[in-house]
Amino acid sequence: MVLGTTSDAGKSITALAFCRILNDMGYRVMQIGCDPKADSTASLHGKGSIDTVLELVRTRKNDFTLEDMVTPGFGGVLCVEAGGPTPGLGCAGRGIITALEKLEEKGAYEVHRPDVVIYDVLGDVVCGGFSMPMRSGYADRGFIIT
């Protein structure tokens, strides 16, 4: 499930609500924050900030584990933050593509076997990378929050 919208329209709060409700219903849920601010899952894990996939790629190349990318949150909801490029360099959309590829490469979906993956995607940027979860078959439904 992809949730997208313009900034400050309540997308992350909606994603949080979906995660908690689906988790309470017994589903194994993973939320992937796809915003360079990397704050989508903060309310779920309560740690302030977590390492983003792109920070791990930049600082440790490929020398990190799946556990470094996935943080357990409220009720076992799995929290991931894609992160963004170095400010002023790179493309945030390309960063999302890299993060999703890295999760797949490290076996996130096979190991954790989520029933539902919620992608909290920034929707006010004209960039093909932000549509990656839908375009590449990572998600089968998308919702625009207005």
Protein language model regions, located:
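Walker A (P-loop) phosphate-binding motif
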Residues: 1-29
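Short glycine-centered, acidic/aromatic-flanked micro-motifs in structured strand/loop junctions
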Residues: 4-5, 82, 146
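Electropositive phosphate-/nucleotide-binding environments in soluble metabolic enzymes
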Residues: 8, 16, 34, 93-97
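Short glycine/serine/threonine-rich phosphate/pyrophosphate-binding segments
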Residues: 11-15, 38-41, 121-129
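N-terminal phosphate/diphosphate-binding loop that engages ATP/GTP or pyrophosphate donors
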Residues: 18-83
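Generic enzyme active-site microenvironment
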Residues: 31-33, 118, 145
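Phosphate-binding/switch loop-helix module in NTP-utilizing enzymes
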Residues: 78-138
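Conserved beta-strand/loop subsegment of P-loop NTPase cores
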Residues: 140-146
